[in-house]
Amino acid sequence: NLRASRSFPFVSKVLGVNFIDVATNAIVGENVPEPVDLMAKTYNHVAIKVPQFSWTRLAGADPFLGVEMASTGEVASFGADLHEAYWASIASTTGFRVPQPHKGVLLGGNIDTPEFKIIATKLYNLGFKLFCSNPDVEAFLNNIPHVAAKRIWFPLKDKRKLREVFDDYEIQFVINLAKYRAPNTTNEDYVARRNAVDFGLPLLNEPKTC
């Protein structure tokens, strides 16, 4: 597909072949190379391509991922293995900074998400303090064996006071696994997601990524 302008350079760099040259030669019928099974080769790197979202440039937009195309670009990341490549991609697209142990994580969203309990347990065992703004989420988290969470005051209409709350509890990143897009701008999941972006905090809202 010659229209895949971003995929062509990505695949060319990953596999070490300039496919634009190959395609051009094939079109004009000159110096067409013999077919080669590039996937049979061994490479010393792994590469992935991830979407780039522009939530910081869209004031008030809900940083919610749905089926529609919401990305405004892509980033290619390389690493020695899949995990290194993925870490590089997260850092380059979201400004993700690894939160420090014993700092706060704000959890919210759909507690029926299968991964929710696993995520909360791992974070707690790593030494993070778990916070939430919803009583149902609080009850769910505190019902997980050997996990403790605290529900905090969460001003929905006052960004300055909300910033103070984030600072007081040393909340360093937000995980919000909401199932549906927020119906309005006073929805607590929307407020958590939007202000994570506005405060420059890492936001994760996809279960597998979390």
Model-inferred region functions:
Residues N1-Q100, N110:
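ATP-dependent carboxylate activation and anion-phosphoryl transfer catalytic cores
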Residues A91-G104, L123, E164-I171:
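Glycine-rich phosphate/diphosphate-binding loops that line cofactor/substrate pockets in enzymes
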Residues G127-D136, F140-L141:
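Short internal beta-strands
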